[in-house]
């Protein structure tokens, strides 16, 4: 018997999301206009809380849908205007271009990145050294590329290697369901569990590496570009401004990587089983023998394009998104990717997040129009200039660990800029606050997958169930990094940021605009 019209509509609404989640969103949509009539300020904060809730529940439903419905309603009832949303989007066009073109551009360099991580995995036998190499490689790549893409590449390597060994362990040559362990021989099971532990630790080291590298440059994370634009900094300026905090944090983060592997804490320390290494080495040798001259040329071309990318970013030869577009054109032209559908696949990863970011800007417009953050900013600005830095860092960190850091970074840098333009703080203090906001947004956010887009991407990937990486386990494995990165970042903001920045100015390396 066919279901009723009402039941059909209910099932279609937000698809596979749980019924309680659908009901919660409907309640939000009914309550918001009523509260807005009574108190626009309270309604504005309620909208922000609801939006953060949709981000926290990203595994139940992609936040673009519920967040978009809330944003559309906010414009309809007058919490902000469509014109203001357009202005916010226009002001952040560079960020949208970064997400659209840079992420897609790096997609066409995946073969080179896969080659690099495969060589690392099979060439280095020491687990401590291998973990450090993955962390450093991910950090370096994330300083110039998009963190999501770097994690996507490492996931591709891990899924590929897991699949190779899983087929051997289940004594099957054809493609099988990787989640089906029913055909695994008993003596392979222990080895497979050890291999899962090994891959889990590598993935977490790589994920944290993207955060360590991503905070250092203006293209490492989308919010960095927003902050750099608000402060008027180019690539080199941004790197130097952040370095009093980011360099000590990077060093301590890498030491943490070695420590947890050495002491086998928090689920780290599992080594690559020798049986697995033999299987993977055989497969790699076979692949190398089958690699044609055309394949080798592709790798060389991608490496040259990588050099162009780093050079163009460092010298600020064009807007970041346009440099990404040049990478797409060069990579596709010189590696023979000419089919429209093949090119289109490169954009599937970035466009949903680009659309979500546009919804962020709608909520930012509400925050500005309803002056929601004014009380918090006033509280922070009443403190001494020295204390302001730590307070901004802490407030950013708390919110970033449960919400998306692009959203948080955008809000706080807008408020700080408004305070500077109104004369509440000096330009010099504003530039120091921009560093505190950027580091506070990026570093503590490794605490949960909600804060780091790369972590959320890993958690929702096909790899996570294969290696038994759950939300709780990810939070537990990230804990040592969360503590070290957050505390070292706070100490650097408190004690090294102002004096080192002053010294840079005296040396003539940076200047206040």
UniProtKB/Swiss-Prot annotation:
Record keywords, A-Z: Antiport, Cell inner membrane, Cell membrane, Ion transport, Membrane, Sodium, Sodium transport, Transmembrane, Transmembrane helix, Transport
List, alphabetically, the NCBIfam families matched. NhaB, PRK09547.1
Output this protein's name.
Answer: Na(+)/H(+) antiporter NhaB
One example GO MF annotation: sodium:proton antiporter activity
Function, in words: Na(+)/H(+) antiporter that extrudes sodium in exchange for external protons.
Family (UniProt): Belongs to the NhaB Na(+)/H(+) (TC 2.A.34) antiporter family.
Show the Pfam families listed in the entry. Answer: NhaB
Q: How does it sit in the membrane?
A: Multi-pass membrane protein
May I have one GO cellular component term?
plasma membrane
Which cysteines does the record link by disulfide bonds? none
Q: Where does the chain cross the membrane?
A: 23-43, 52-72, 97-117, 120-140, 144-164, 202-222, 238-258, 303-323, 348-368, 391-411, 447-467, 475-495
What InterPro entries does this protein map onto? Na+/H+_antiporter_NhaB
Q: Which reaction does it catalyse?
A: 2 Na(+)(in) + 3 H(+)(out) = 2 Na(+)(out) + 3 H(+)(in)
- Where does this one sit in the cell? Cell inner membrane
Presence of the UniProt keyword Cell membrane in the record: yes
């Amino acid at each position: 018997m066919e279901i009723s019209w009402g039941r059909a509509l209910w099932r279609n609404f937000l698809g596979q999301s749980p019924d309680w989640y659908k009901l919660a969103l409907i309640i939000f949509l009914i309550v918001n206009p009523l509260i807005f009539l009574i108190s626009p300020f309270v309604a504005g904060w309620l909208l922000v809380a609801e939006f953060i809730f949709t981000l926290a529940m990203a595994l139940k439903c992609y936040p673009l849908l519920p967040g978009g419905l809330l944003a559309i309603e906010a414009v309809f009832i007058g919490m902000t205007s469509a014109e203001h949303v357009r202005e916010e989007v226009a002001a952040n066009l560079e960020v949208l271009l970064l997400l659209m073109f840079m992420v897609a551009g790096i997609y066409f360099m995946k073969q080179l990145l896969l080659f690099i991580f495969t060589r690392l995995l099979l060439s280095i036998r020491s687990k401590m050294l291998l973990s450090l190499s993955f962390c450093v490689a991910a950090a370096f790549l994330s300083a110039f590329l998009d963190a999501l893409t770097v994690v996507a590449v490492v996931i591709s390597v891990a899924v590929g290697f897991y699949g190779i060994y899983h087929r051997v362990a289940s004594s099957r040559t054809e493609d099988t369901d990787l989640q089906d362990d029913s055909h695994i021989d008993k003596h392979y099971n222990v080895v497979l569990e050890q291999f899962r532990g090994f891959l889990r630790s590598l993935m977490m080291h790589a994920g944290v590496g993207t955060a360590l590298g991503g905070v250092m440059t203006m293209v490492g994370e989308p919010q960095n570009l927003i902050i750099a634009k608000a402060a008027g900094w180019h690539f080199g300026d941004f790197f130097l401004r952040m370095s009093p905090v980011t360099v000590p944090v990077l060093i301590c983060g890498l030491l943490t990587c070695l420590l947890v592997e050495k002491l086998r804490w928090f689920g780290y320390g599992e080594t690559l089983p020798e049986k697995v290494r033999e299987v993977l080495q055989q497969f790699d040798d076979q692949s190398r023998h089958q690699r044609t001259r055309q394949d080798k040329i592709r790798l060389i071309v991608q490496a040259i394009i990588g050099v162009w990318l780093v050079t163009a970013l460092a010298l600020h030869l064009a807007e970041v998104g346009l440099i990404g577009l040049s990478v797409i054109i060069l990579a596709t032209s010189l590696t023979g990717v000419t089919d429209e559908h093949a090119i289109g696949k490169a954009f599937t990863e970035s466009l949903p997040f680009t659309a979500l970011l546009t919804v962020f800007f709608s909520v930012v417009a509400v925050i500005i129009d309803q002056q929601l953050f004014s009380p918090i900013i006033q509280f922070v600005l009443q403190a001494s200039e020295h204390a302001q830095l730590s307070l901004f860092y802490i407030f950013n960190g708390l919110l970033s660990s449960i919400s998306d850091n692009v959203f948080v970074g955008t809000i706080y840098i807008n408020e700080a800029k408004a305070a500077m333009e109104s004369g509440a703080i000096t330009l010099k203090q504003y530039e120091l606050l921009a560093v505190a906001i950027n580091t506070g947004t990026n570093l503590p956010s490794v605490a949960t997958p909600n804060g780091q887009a790369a972590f959320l991407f890993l958690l929702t990937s096909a790899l996570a169930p294969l290696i038994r990486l759950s939300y709780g386990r990810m939070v537990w494995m990230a804990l040592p990094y969360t503590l070290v990165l957050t505390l070292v970042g706070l100490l650097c903001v408190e004690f090294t940021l102002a004096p080192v920045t002053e010294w840079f100015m005296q040396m003539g390396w940076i200047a206040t605009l």
